[in-house]
Every structure is written in C-alpha cells, then in structure tokens.
C-alpha cells in the first residue's frame, strides 16, 4: 500500500479582473499564471469595460494574452460571477472562480459558493502596521498607502508607541498622497 496525495488541477477556471478606478493588468497575471502552471486546461476571464474605452482596458487585454487566457468576456460585477458559476449561452460554466472585486462581487461569490469553487470572499483592502521608533517613516507610509489607495473603504492603521514616528509617517503620507493619481482615495 502506498499513501500520499496527487495534485489534480480543475479543468477550467474563471478569473475576474475588476475595472474600477484604474486598470489591473497585474491581477490578470497573478490569477492566470498560477492556474496555467498548475495545469488548468482553460482559463476564462471576465472584466468590465473600462471608462473611456468601451471594452476591457488594452493593458489588461495584453496581460491576459501574455498569461494565456483562453476566453475573454467584457462583463463585470455580480452578473459576471453568475455567468461563470452557472453558465450562459455564451459563457460556459467553470469549476472555480478567482479574483477580487467590490462588495457586489464579493457577495456574488459568497452566493455561488457550493455551485462552484471560489478563491475567497475578499472585502476592502486593509493593513495594520505595528512599528516602533526604529521604523523608517517613509517605508511605513508607503506600506499604509499601498493598501489605502485601492478603495475608499480600505483601512490602513498604524500602531506605534512613538509620537515622532506617528508624526513623521503622517507627513510622508500627505507628501506621497499628493503625488499619487489615487491620492484622493488614499
């Protein structure tokens, strides 16, 4: 008798690439490449039309092509999750859905769980940084902004015993937020 385990990839995966405030080609890569490396036969992608383009953002399309997405649909939100979970005349049902999204996408993924596999039910981005007086305030500010720029509902929290660090981090946040195209959100 031999005891062990075998990794058997699902046949097809649906990825969801949001198109809210800015294009996310890295999301297409981060979702598709692991699936392809694992041996998934078919990757189906859904992404809404990007503002001003009327279709999936060109940078996202290029990333999907490079990563090896097999089918791309210009649809988003809860309806894209439902299409991949249950299938339509156009979109075939997938075995598993992965990818981030807003609260409606998260709720849709929660509701289809059981009919199809999902990666997780993600909420708004959040980060908690615990730092003492030895922390670099510039890097600490960047760590906080890296999450808070995603969404107005994102939360970035610093816990420190150093009043100087707290003041310096706040100053760097104000500086960097002023330079970011997403600074108002952050």
Where are the regions that the model predicts?
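Short acidic, glycine/serine/threonine-rich loops at helix termini
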Residues: 26-28, 54-60, 84-87, 107-111, ...
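Short, conserved catalytic or adaptor-binding loops enriched in Gly and charged residues
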Residues: 63-66, 119-121, 179-186
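NAD(P)-dependent aldehyde/semialdehyde dehydrogenase
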Residues: 153-186
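Short beta-strand/turn micro-motifs composed of small residues
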Residues: 17, 47, 131, 160-161
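Conserved small-residue-rich beta-alpha loop and adjacent elements
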Residues: 1-58, 62
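Conserved NAD(P)+-binding/catalytic subdomain of aldehyde/semialdehyde dehydrogenases
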Residues: 66-155
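Short, hinge-like loop/turn segments at secondary-structure boundaries
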Residues: 61-65, 90-92, 174-176
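A structural signal for isolated positions on well-ordered beta-strands in alpha/beta enzyme cores
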Residues: 42-44, 128, 157
